[in-house]
């Protein structure tokens, strides 16, 4: 199956909708303490810079590795990657600016807040 067909199947199977920050998502769990979503970025998409108010953990599921851009001050940033070198999780602390970009055709991750 081609990458385009995999992306289409993931969106349809999980009933994903466009996310305001870019990409597609579906909420799969929510209670008073935690929320978890599946989040999908294609190669032409990115999750735009935004500042989070709660600590968020990203979990890699499939596709190409994902670059995570973070900044404490909104000016200097660093890049981490999940989905390669046995690194499948990354936590972004509350108050941090961050953005996401797939390194290939697509990246499917989970986000837990």
List the predicted regions and their residue ranges.
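Non-catalytic, conserved peripheral segments adjacent to functional cores
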Residues: 2-91, 99, 104-107, 111-113
């Amino acid at each position: 199956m081609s990458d385009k067909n995999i992306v289409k199947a993931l969106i349809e199977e999980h009933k994903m909708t466009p996310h305001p920050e870019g990409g597609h998502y579906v909420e799969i769990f929510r209670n008073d303490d935690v929320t978890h979503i599946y989040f999908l970025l294609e190669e032409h998409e990115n999750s735009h810079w935004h500042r989070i108010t709660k600590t968020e953990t990203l979990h890699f599921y499939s596709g190409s590795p994902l670059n995570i851009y973070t900044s404490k001050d909104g000016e200097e940033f660093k890049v981490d990657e999940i989905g390669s070198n046995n690194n499948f999780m990354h936590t972004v602390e509350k108050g941090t600016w961050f953005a996401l970009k797939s390194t290939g055709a697509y990246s499917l991750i989970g986000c837990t807040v």
